[in-house]
Design a protein with these regions (language model features):
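Eukaryotic N-terminal low-complexity, Ser/Thr- and Lys/Arg-rich leader segments
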Residues: 1-7
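Short beta-strand or tight-loop elements
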Residues: 5, 22-24, 71
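Short gly/ser/thr-rich secondary-structure transition/capping motifs
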Residues: 17-23, 56-57
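Glycine-rich beta-strand-centered segment in the early N-terminal region that forms part
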Residues: 27-45, 56-96, 114, 119-122
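Cytochrome P450 core scaffold surrounding the K-helix E-X-X-R motif
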Residues: 48-54
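A structural motif shared across PLP-dependent enzymes of the aminotransferase-like
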Residues: 96-112
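A glycine-rich, Thr/Ser-enriched phosphate-binding loop motif common to dinucleotide/cofactor-binding enzymes
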Residues: 120-131
Length: 131
């Protein structure tokens, strides 16, 4: 699968003391570093995400960041030998939407220790629902 040059993400910015979320086009280079590139299928919306997007809680440690503290999807590329293209993975917390870009994007770049391989008998949707 080819990764497009630009894709959509829900990104949170801070300008002076004002937090401003926006749906915008970004590139893979805009994402935080990670060994695993994932085509995202599912994320969730929870209280912590709302705090991050509104600035009501001091969730994000740096700006801008893609929101979403969890994500499930399919590995596209990986330099980690334990995760191969086509593997289904889940990442929850692990600094997502705090110090690393989160799951509200068409693609994510995850650290290999954040990406958990989903067992074959569980769909990414079910894994996301369980967390």
């Amino acid at each position: 699968m080819t990764i497009p040059n630009k894709f959509l993400a829900f990104r949170i910015h801070q300008e002076e003391k004002t937090v401003r979320p926006a749906l915008e086009e970004i590139t893979l280079e805009d994402l935080t570093e990670g060994e695993v590139i994932v085509k995202n299928s599912y994320s969730s919306i929870n209280y912590k995400d709302a705090l991050a997007a509104t600035g009501a809680g001091k969730i994000l440690r740096k700006f801008p960041l893609v929101g979403g503290v969890d994500v499930a999807g399919t590995v596209i590329e990986s330099s980690d030998p334990t995760l191969k293209p086509g593997d289904k993975v889940l990442a929850a917390c692990s600094g997502l939407s705090e110090t690393n870009d989160g799951g509200y994007s068409e693609y994510s770049r995850l650290t290999s220790n954040a990406a958990i391989k989903i067992p074959e008998n569980i769909t990414p949707r079910t894994a996301m629902a369980i967390g």
